[in-house]
Amino acid sequence: MPPIVYPAAALTGAPRSRRIIAPRREGWSGVAIMEWELRAQQWVDTHPHDEINFVFEGTLLVESDGECVELSAGDSVLVPAGSTGCYRAPEYARMLAVYGPNPDGRPSAIEGLSPLP
């Protein structure tokens, strides 16, 4: 089987993001990968799949199940399937999110994006 190329795309939207390997609404058995930027913002969601975040730049606070960890460039964290994750950048964070399999295509429960004071 030949390699599959996913062309580069600009970061767009709120929060700024781009789909590298897009999650499919009908589900996926491999991984989905996205790049995210937060600028003095937080994003909260509950997802049916494992989510691994790798921080490229800045500082990212991740809270799940009552525990909060602080990540810097080069750090990564796993938020397990079924968990609610709060991803908070006090100033700026750019990260790569890898989503584990979601064969049933169950959607995430998105609480949304909000600015930090």
Predicted regions and their residues:
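Short hydrophobic/aromatic-rich beta-strand segments that constitute the beta-sheet cores
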Residues: 45, 62, 95-97
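Glycine- and acidic-residue-biased ligand/ion/polar-headgroup-sensing regions
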Residues: 49-60, 65
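Conserved short histidine dyad/triad with adjacent acidic residue
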Residues: 30-47
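Short acidic-glycine-tyrosine-enriched beta hairpin
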Residues: 66-82
